[in-house]
Amino acid sequence: MIPGEILPEDGEITLNAGRDTLTVEVTNTGDRPAQVGSHYHFYEVNDHLHFDREPTRGFRLDIAAGTAVRFEPGQSRTVQLVRYAGSGDIYGFQGRVMGPATGESA
């Protein structure tokens, strides 16, 4: 075995099983491409990406860790989001949440 090596069992691995998901139509209205990483808080992505933001609080892209989705200028696409696991507190990114993503104190 190599240090850090992972030896998964045979078969399919289901990502984010059992978590809440949300499908959103997103349009890049900017003049440059915008790329969003797998774990970026979708509510706080580039302001040139237009979509109904409020429902996306506490969600990220439902894609494999370390990957990203690129939106070319003028491009519209539908993406699936998944709720963050854990406490639901969101810190950092653009600083628009800085605490609970949902609930009375959000």
UniProtKB/Swiss-Prot annotation:
InterPro entries: Urease_beta-like, Urease_betasu_sf, Urease_subunit
Record-stated family: Belongs to the urease beta subunit family.
Annotated EC: 3.5.1.5
Keyword tags: Cytoplasm, Hydrolase
Organism: Alkalilimnicola ehrlichii (strain ATCC BAA-1101 / DSM 17681 / MLHE-1)
One Pfam match: Urease_beta
Protein name: Urease subunit beta
SUPFAM superfamilies named in the record: Urease, beta-subunit
Oligomeric and partner information: Heterotrimer of UreA (gamma), UreB (beta) and UreC (alpha) subunits. Three heterotrimers associate to form the active enzyme.
Pathway, per record: Nitrogen metabolism; urea degradation; CO(2) and NH(3) from urea (urease route): step 1/1
Subcellular location(s) per record: Cytoplasm
Signal peptide: none
